[in-house]
UniProtKB/Swiss-Prot annotation:
Active site: 237, 266, 285
Protein name: Glyoxylate/hydroxypyruvate reductase B
PROSITE patterns: D_2_HYDROXYACID_DH_2, D_2_HYDROXYACID_DH_3
Species in which this protein is naturally found: Escherichia coli O6:H1 (strain CFT073 / ATCC 700928 / UPEC)
Annotated localization: Cytoplasm
This protein's GO CC annotations: cytosol; plasma membrane
Record keywords: Cytoplasm, NAD, NADP, Oxidoreductase
A Pfam family per the record: 2-Hacid_dh_C
InterPro entries found in the cross-reference section: D-isomer_2-hydroxyacid_DH, D-isomer_2_OHA_DH_cat_dom, D-isomer_DH_CS, D-isomer_DH_NAD-bd, Glyo/OHPyrv_Rdtase_B, NAD(P)-bd_dom_sf
Length: 324
């Protein structure tokens, strides 16, 4: 008999078929307590779990005594209780490499659109305000040769640095847990402490996962240290930033603009002050949202679950020691 798995995110037909070749697949709409209660027998027998954008916590795991592996269609896993999974010897798989280039493209798009005021001036054109040759009130700021500060020099940080260095001749500063020799050799990137990065960068790009240590890492103190002409970009996790402090910094002119793909609460409330600011580009967590990349992530997640339930955890496993 095939192992039973629960799928809580729709898959393309070919990937669903691949999953069904290996498992008995039960599809549910979400992982809410109501869904779990209504499908208690299925959850009790499931050995695998696959999907995204739902919390997997100790309470859910209590309902899934046979669970051996869970696979998320994402690189981030802050909605998983890793300690609870590990304590129960349940493998957690994710998709860290598939989306690197696409998210770096999104970051660069936010850099360009904020600096050149693309969204703002496009809306002005649509509103009929372009009635003569444009003047300084339509101008943006250059990107080329400006200093880019990257907070978090992982795969995505490296891909962003490549674009900025070779495409825009931008000097690169970075802050990370350790020196990154490849970044320094390939992009002439300079390691510095966070205060120095904030003080010297024209663009500050935040690419950090959400952990207890990074929660509200950026607050009023950090924004006050940035140049008043600086542009802040966040495409990591929303709660790494104190959003009220960001709003205040923008309102007071402590920073020039912001490009945001992530927020403390998602979806962003329609009455958020951020949405009334012309110098803010806010997009709905689209970092990896292309047809090609989202398919690749789903395919990777399917393969990850197949591997995990076959005892193969050489790659893409958050807690591989569970398999020892």
């Amino acid at each position: 008999m095939k192992p039973s798995v629960i799928l809580y995110k729709a898959l393309p037909d070919d990937l669903l078929q691949r999953l069904q070749e290996h498992f008995t697949v039960h599809q549910v709409a979400n992982l809410s307590p109501q869904t779990v209660e209504q499908n208690a027998a299925i959850f009790a027998e499931a050995e695998g779990l696959l999907g995204s954008n739902e919390n997997v916590d100790a309470a859910l795991l209590e309902k899934m005594p046979k669970l051996r592996a869970t696979s998320t269609i994402s690189v981030g896993y802050d909605n998983f209780d890793v300690d609870a999974l590990t304590a129960r010897k349940i493998l957690l798989m994710h998709t860290p490499t598939v989306l690197t280039e696409t998210v770096a493209d999104t970051l660069m798009a936010l850099v360009l659109s904020t600096a050149r005021r693309v969204v703002e001036v496009a809306e002005r054109v649509k509103a009929g305000e372009w009635t003569a040759s444009i003047g300084p009130d339509w101008y943006g700021t250059d990107v080329h040769h400006k200093t880019l500060g990257i907070v978090g020099m992982g795969r995505i940080g490296m891909a962003l640095a490549q674009r900025a260095h070779f495409g825009f001749n931008m000097p690169i500063l970075y802050n990370a847990r350790r020196h990154h020799k490849e970044a320094e050799e390939r992009f002439n990137a300079r390691y510095c402490n966070l205060d120095t990065l904030l003080q010297e960068s024209d663009f500050v790009c935040l690419i950090l996962p959400l952990t207890d240590e990074t929660h509200h890492l950026f607050g009023a103190e950090q924004f006050a240290k940035m140049k008043s002409s600086a542009i802040f970009i966040n495409a990591g996790r929303g709660p790494v930033v104190d959003e009220n402090a960001l709003i205040a910094a923008l309102q007071k002119g402590e920073i020039h603009a912001a490009g945001l793909d992530v927020f403390e609460q998602e979806p962003l409330s329609v009455d958020s002050p951020l949405l009334s600011m012309a110098n803010v580009v806010a997009v709905p967590h689209i970092g990896s949202a292309t047809h090609e990349t989202r398919y690749g992530m789903a395919a990777c997640a399917v393969d990850n679950l197949i591997d995990a339930l076959q005892g193969k955890v050489e790659k893409n496993c958050v807690n591989p020691h569970v398999a020892d």
